[in-house]
Amino acid sequence: MSIRKIFEEELSQLKTELVEMCRLTEQMISDAIEALVNRDRELGKSIAGADKRVDEYEMDIEKRCMRILLKQQPVAKDFREVSTALKMITDIERFGDQASDIGDLVYTMPGERYIKKLEHITAMGNLAEKMVRESVDSFISNNEALANEVIALDDKMDDLFLTVKKELIELIKKDGANGD
């Protein structure tokens, strides 16, 4: 098998693992939001196990990337693909950690009702799932237009965050506490 063929096979395996990591992280985000909205303590607790698997994916993919860089010494486009994968796994792993943190929070929350419906939180979770999925899809398919759409979605996420923050400040002010 030629060196180029070996490289292409290793890159294909890298992309397959990256997609698997992404799909698991998407599910974790979905589960975290579902657990939060429904106050499902057991679902919240279960997310930690998936987070361990995402951590394993990160280590495995990082090793694969390093092996490719050291053995194949890619240049130009090939190097960018491997270095982009390294950056992506760090971000995807962080998303998994954050989903796990939400799960832990749900597990330890008291059983009181929410004072407000979590509609914007649900929208943020759905948007986060879409961003993770489309980020990896744009990388796998080398689709710059899709990557730019993900960047635009980040602005929507920022807007949702500001909306939630303002609503929380208003709720705190109504309660008589200092909302600033």
Name every feature range the model reports, one short phrase each.
Residues 1-180:
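Cytosolic, long alpha-helical scaffolding segments
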